Amino acid sequence: MPFRSNNPLTRDELLSRFFPQFHPVTTFNSGLSGGSFLIEHQGQRFVVRQPHDPDAPQSAFLRQYRALSQLPACIAPKPHLYLRDWMVVDYLPGEVKTYLPDTNELAGLLYYLHQQPRFGWRITLLPLLELYWQQSDPARRTVGWLRMLKRLRKAREPRLLRLSPLHMDVHAGNLVHSAPGLKLIDWEYAGDGDIALELAAVWVENTDQHRQLVNDYATRAKIYPAQLWRQVRRWFPWLLMLKAGWFEYRWRQTGDQQFIRLADDTWRQLLIKQ
C-alpha cells in the first residue's frame, strides 16, 4: 500500500497511525548500510525500514518498494506500506549465517530471480562511479582513482550477456536460510542488468568459490562456463571501483573508520585484478 505524505512521520507517528497494536521488538544494526527495526503483535512481525542513504533521492526508495511488490514471496519479503522515509515489509523467519550457502543452492536462487519479469529500470554504473568521486573526501581523491575512472568512461560498460532483474547486494548477511529455501533481503540496489554483473558482485570468500558459483549457474542457464566466467571478469574493474567509491562516499557521510579500511582493501584488490 503506497501512501503519500509531504511531511515525514516520526517512528511513533508511523506506528500510532498505521500499526497501533504493534510494538517495537528489536533494532537491526548489522550490515554496512544502516539499521531497521522489528514490530510485533500477537506473533505477527513486520520489519520497518528507512532509506539507508539520507542523501539519495526518494525515487530510489520507491523503486525498492516497487521491486518488492512484484517479486514472488518465495525469494523476497512482501511490502505492506510505503510512504516518505518509511517502508514496512514482512519479517522473514530463518537464520542469517556468516558465510555463503552451497554454491549450487545460491546459483539456483539467483537463476530463479533472473527468470522473473524485469523491474523496468536499468542499473548503470558510470553515473554512480562519478557521483562517488564527486562526493568523496577531496583528500582521498587520487590520480590513480581519476585515471581508472577515465579509463572505464572511455571503455564503456561490457556488452550485455543477458538482461534480467538483479539484486546487486548478495552476501551472507542478506541471505535468509528458511525452511522453504533461501530468500534475499535488502533490495535497495535492485534493477535490471547483466546476469554476469550480479555474479561478479557476489561477496565470495575466494576465487575458487567464485568460479564454482559461476559454473553452477552456467549449468542451470545453459551457458558455457568459460564464456560466463569471461563475462564476469569483464565486470570486475567496474564492481571494484563501485565498491571502493561507495566506501569512500560512506566514509565522508559517516566518518566511520570501517569504511576507510574497506576502501583501502578494495583499492588493493583493484590493483591485483587489473
Curated annotation (Swiss-Prot):
Pathway per the UniProt entry: Cofactor biosynthesis; thiamine diphosphate biosynthesis; thiamine phosphate from thiamine: step 1/1
Catalysed reactions, as listed in the record: thiamine + ATP = thiamine phosphate + ADP + H(+)
InterPro entries associated with the record: Aminoglycoside_PTrfase, Kinase-like_dom_sf, Thiamine_kinase
E.C. numbers: 2.7.1.89
Superkingdom of the source species: Bacteria
Described purpose of this protein according to its UniProt entry: Catalyzes the ATP-dependent phosphorylation of thiamine to thiamine phosphate. Is involved in thiamine salvage.
Gene (name only): thiK
Family named by the database record: Belongs to the thiamine kinase family.
GO molecular function: ATP binding; thiamine kinase activity
Protein name: Thiamine kinase
SUPFAM superfamilies: Protein kinase-like (PK-like) (SSF56112)
Keywords of this entry: ATP-binding, Kinase, Nucleotide-binding, Transferase
GO biological process: thiamine diphosphate biosynthetic process; thiamine metabolic process
